[in-house]
């Protein structure tokens, strides 16, 4: 299956907005596995693998012959992992059965993490491609999983009475992307219009009910050093949406390679929109969306060896939110926090250059700080590709 990375964009976008022919897209999605915390309690330890460490069952017309316990765990993500990580894991197309059958805590955690990353990247490309067209509505399938299994949800199963689950459903990586970037009113992204590796095509789009006046800043982050180079600053003045789209100036990519750099696109408010809705009345300079853009599939990235540590600090003074400090000794990509405590993080699944960053844990209901401290853990792409290939 194609990864659509770099994102393929039209050289000239079609006319957009309600005055032009448009469509509503319903529905699309991609399979993603839940976290180890969610999935593992439903399996015996010797079955902790995407293929359960068992011979494959034969399934057709909703009937399976064989004893493989994963045969009825809904939808597999083999094709996604092979497409996005097959080269890095040295898996042949259509192969890798031994890798999918590796059992144990760390192999299973790596398999589940890589599946969730692939789900997020596939949907990210699909949504960004959709917003480059005059598509004024998009329905993703689906919101939540119906039990701890491989499924289409952006949230895990949400019954807190079942072992490993959190109240309302633990957010998968894709759900954090939807909140931070993909379903933000204003988004900027970049891709190829047949011009890579020398140039990138970028757009900014406003689907909000109010006009947007702000800046779009696009930088290139070097993976080996974490150094950031500003490539473009654009004064964006967009009418009210939906479908207010502007093509940005063509971006030269001199000395920038998709395997060594990622792009960072940030949209900031320049001034508060007069008469704007409450959620649109942001302070001058406020960040409205942040987008980390790959110019190559993830298995082509030259990621440095990185160690990322998380430390639970203290409650924020105005409530039950808890500060967590993440520290990396080198650039880490797709840094993802997981915990057994009921709640979500203020941000998750992001690029972390060498240094530290603070995020908040926002509890669902009463805070269980002891459980948060004892169960929080962190993943990132280079680490999990290593544990997946060396286990």
Question: What do the PLM-derived regions correspond to, one by one?
Answer:
Residues 305-353, 360-363:
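C-terminal accessory/binding modules appended to enzymatic or scaffolding proteins
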Residues 217-261, 342-369:
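Intrinsically disordered, low-complexity Pro/Gly/Ser/Thr-rich segments with frequent PxxP/GP/PP motifs
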Residues 180-216, 298-327:
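Surface beta-strand/loop "capping" patches
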Residues 136-142, 336, 375-379:
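Conserved active-site loop/cleft motifs that coordinate metal ions or position small ligands
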Residues 3-210:
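Substrate-binding clefts and catalytic carboxylate motifs of secreted carbohydrate-active enzymes
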Residues 142-143, 190, 204-206, 216-222, ...:
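Active-site proximal loops enriched in glycine and acidic residues that flank catalytic Cys/His/Asp
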Residues 208-214, 228-229, 329-336:
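Short acidic/proline- and small/hydrophobic-mixed sequence motifs that coincide with surface turns
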Residues 201-204, 244-306, 364-391:
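Terminal connector regions
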């Amino acid at each position: 299956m194609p990864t659509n990375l770099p994102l393929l964009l039209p050289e000239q976008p079609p006319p957009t907005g309600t005055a032009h022919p448009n469509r509503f897209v319903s529905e699309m999605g991609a399979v993603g596995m839940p976290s180890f915390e969610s999935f593992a309690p439903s399996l015996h330890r010797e079955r902790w693998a995407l293929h359960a460490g068992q011979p494959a069952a034969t399934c057709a017309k909703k009937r399976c012959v064989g004893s493989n316990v994963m045969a009825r765990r809904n939808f597999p993500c083999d094709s996604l992992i092979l497409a996005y990580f097959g080269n890095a894991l040295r898996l042949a197309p259509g192969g890798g059965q031994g890798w999918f059958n590796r059992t144990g805590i760390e192999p299973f955690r790596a398999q589940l993490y890589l599946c969730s990353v692939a789900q997020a990247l596939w949907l990210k490309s699909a949504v960004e491609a959709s917003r480059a067209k005059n598509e004024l509505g998009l329905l993703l399938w689906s919101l939540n999983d119906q039990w701890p299994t491989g499924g289409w949800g952006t949230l895990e199963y949400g019954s807190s009475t079942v072992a490993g689950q959190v109240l309302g459903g633990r957010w998968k990586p894709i759900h954090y992307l939807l909140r931070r970037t993909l379903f933000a009113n204003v988004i900027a992204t970049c891709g190829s219009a047949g011009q890579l590796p020398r140039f990138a095509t970028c757009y900014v789009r406003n689907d909000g009910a109010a006009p947007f006046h702000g800046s779009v800043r696009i930088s290139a982050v070097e993976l080996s050093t974490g150094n950031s180079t500003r490539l473009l600053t654009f004064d964006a003045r967009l009418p009210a949406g939906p479908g207010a789209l502007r093509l940005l100036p063509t971006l030269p990519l001199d000395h920038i390679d998709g395997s060594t750099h990622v792009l960072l696109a940030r949209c900031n408010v320049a001034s508060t929109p007069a008469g704007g809705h409450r959620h649109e009345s942001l302070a001058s300079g406020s960040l409205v969306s942040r987008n980390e853009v790959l110019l190559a599939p993830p298995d082509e990235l030259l990621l440095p060896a990185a160690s990322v540590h998380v430390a639970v600090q203290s409650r924020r003074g105005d409530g039950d939110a808890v500060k967590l400090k993440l520290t990396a000794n080198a650039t880490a990509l797709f840094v993802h926090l997981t915990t057994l405590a009921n709640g979500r993080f203020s941000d998750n699944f992001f690029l972390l250059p060498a240094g530290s960053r603070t995020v908040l844990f926002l509890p669902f209901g009463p805070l269980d700080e002891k459980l948060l401290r004892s169960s929080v853990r962190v993943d990132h792409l280079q680490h999990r590709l290593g544990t997946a290939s060396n286990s």
